[in-house]
Amino acid sequence: MPEQHLTRRDILAAVGSAAVIATAPNAVSPAHAADTEGGTVTTSDGVKLKHMAAGAGRPLVMIPGWSQTAAQFKYQIAGLAQTYRVVAVDMRGHGESQKVNHGYKISRLAKDVHDVLHKLDLHDVTLLGHSMGCSVIWCYWDMYGPERLSKLVLVDQMPFITANPTWSPDEKRDAGAILDAAALYDLYNRLTGPDAAKTTEGFVGGMATKAMPADQKNWIIQQNFKLPRRHAADLLYNHATQDWRDVIPRIKIPTLVVGGKASLVPWTSQVWISKQIKGSRLEVFEENEGGAHFMFMEAHDKFNRIVSEFIA
């Protein structure tokens, strides 16, 4: 498959082509749901974070992506809690966590994860991040190193979202950049403007394969709206301007890198990441098996098997 680079026009076309979203149904429940517990952790700056947990054994802590929720890991909670202690965290402002007006920066979210691991007294943790959750992990590593961690699972996040116009094609490919500065500001302004809902529907709706059922896609979009759009825009801007290419090669614990051939995140950037982390494992899902940005939902059985084998 040729390398994938989205232009500013591609991004704006996705944003502008949202389908009409009906009232979203409840989450499509996994066939065998685990007994899930709910809990609250208060961060060092007083914000109440909600989390879902199930199972017993070695801990697997999962960090959702930008504007995503812990509930979107429902298939992992159901499938992996039979073997592991699975914890999914709603980051500040996201999901069921407290809505506050500060802290929507990757560095603060990394500190929040650090707070969660300490408050729940978790050790030997496999830390899994999806999308922006990977950036949170990279920031955690930059600040705390391997503290309380044993393994990492990095799911579908490029090292740097926003391209420098002076980059060579190879630099752009390896970074995985899909925006330029003008497109980033345009997206920010749309998320803070009167068309914020339509913008979200188009942007997030374009992250799945065509095979994803409409009700599941609509539910994902409704989960996104749990983070107020102003905070979503602020966080996206901070996220999109972080360059992790100097941090990734310093990761020294076993790491699984997961990408998708049909994802908006260029799969070639996942190859670059895997090459920077010595001994890492790379898995790239094909489009016909649900290999877009939400492969952990669209191809949850295969995803869970790969993660379980990696942790074991």
Residue ranges and their predicted role:
Residues 138, 149-191:
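Flexible "cap/lid" loop of the alpha/beta hydrolase fold
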Residues 44, 52-54, 88-132, 136, ...:
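Active-site loop/oxyanion-hole signature of alpha/beta-hydrolase fold enzymes
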Residues 254-291:
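Conserved loop-alpha-helix segment in the C-terminal half of the alpha/beta-hydrolase fold
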Residues 288-300, 304:
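Catalytic histidine-centered segment of alpha/beta-hydrolase-like enzymes
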Residues 217-246:
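Hydrophobic, aromatic-rich cap/lid helix
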Residues 2-18:
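N-terminal secretory signal peptides and thylakoid transit peptides that target proteins
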Residues 47, 52-99:
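Conserved HGGG/HGGXW glycine-rich cap/lid loop of the alpha/beta-hydrolase fold
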Residues 26-44:
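C-terminal segment of N-terminal export signals and the immediately downstream linker at the start
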